[in-house]
């Protein structure tokens, strides 16, 4: 298959894919991959296969194609192809929650400066890197990457990238409990979809609605959360988007948990867990297990709650997800307090505070913790964040956290 025929078949596959005939599109692309003698065409068709498998949640296949794509890029001996290939490797590992590998591949991309593609892709690389740092609960670096990605989006007038970054920022602020910003950013993403997204994939709309649902639930606006989550789920089902279906099921379960309707929450947690296990979303599995533990706690089934927490702990330690560990120590603290087991209670209190220290989840001005309850936060240009009220009260003559870090232990 020559260059022109390869190009024609790739377009045919894209047309099928956009009209929701995914399996037929995959067949066309696989045929191109087998028969095309044109390396640049093979590279492009691998890109299509990577995107399609990502959207279906077939992350292991996505990674497999990304590895073949890197080999094709090396064959082409073109740094532009290599940059794109490494970004796809980074993304595949991000989806499989291999966050250290993601960061490493992203750094490789950023080191390949000077290529024309790198200038277009730097924003996407920064976004993927930010998501990986967030998965590891390294909040300052995550925020730094998201802000960099947002700058690239603004400078290149890339509204799609801006939309994706806004969703990630929504997730970031939901985790550290500034719920006002957790809602603001996905609302901004939804606005971008309305204003510019006529020709975009519907996944952008679905994604922004899902993140709005999460924020509404955390703000206690459960009816609004349900509406947004239903809208997102509808699109996810139409498009066979398994990863998003799993997240929506988790969100539905969390909404029912907020209503203390444990019987309705349980089957939704089970369905979410089943998809997340199938696709390899271990970060999502931790959230499901913590939700299930809370359900058991409501039912006063404390030993069953501890079983769920134990499974979550194994996953969180494996991934290096410190926020997950902090949350489970917090739940254990409540369980052992109820059981009257003082030694275990003390152990988890100590571990809880170790997690807070490690993640630097406290305000450098007042010393109070961040992420314990809903609080308006404000980041300084260095990406350290503080309580907004502390910055307003004390003003800022530079960042107190940066000042502390610059004082060498030898001079203290």
Swiss-Prot record:
GO biological process: positive regulation of neuromuscular synaptic transmission; synaptic transmission, cholinergic
Membrane-spanning residues: none
UniProt cross-references to Gene3D superfamilies, sorted A to Z: Tetratricopeptide repeat domain (1.25.40.10), Zinc/RING finger domain, C3HC4 (zinc finger) (3.30.40.10)
Pfam families reported in the protein's UniProt record: Rapsyn_N, TPR_8, zf-RING_2
InterPro entries per the UniProt record, alphabetical: Postsynaptic, Postsynaptic_CS, RAPsyn, Rapsyn_myristoylation/link_N, TPR-like_helical_dom_sf, TPR_rpt, Znf_RING, Znf_RING/FYVE/PHD
Bilayer disposition of the protein: Peripheral membrane protein
TPR repeats: from-to residues: 6-39, 83-116, 123-156, 163-196, 206-239, 246-279, 286-319
Zinc finger (RING-type) residue numbers: 363-403
Protein location: Cell membrane; Postsynaptic cell membrane; Cytoplasm, Cytoskeleton
Tissues expressing this chain: Expressed in muscle fibers and in neurons.
Family of this protein: Belongs to the RAPsyn family.
Summary of the function given for this chain in its UniProt record: Postsynaptic protein required for clustering of nicotinic acetylcholine receptors (nAChRs) at the neuromuscular junction. It may link the receptor to the underlying postsynaptic cytoskeleton, possibly by direct association with actin or spectrin.
PANTHER family: 43 KDA RECEPTOR-ASSOCIATED PROTEIN OF THE SYNAPSE
Name of the protein: 43 kDa receptor-associated protein of the synapse
Species this protein is from: Gallus gallus (Chicken)
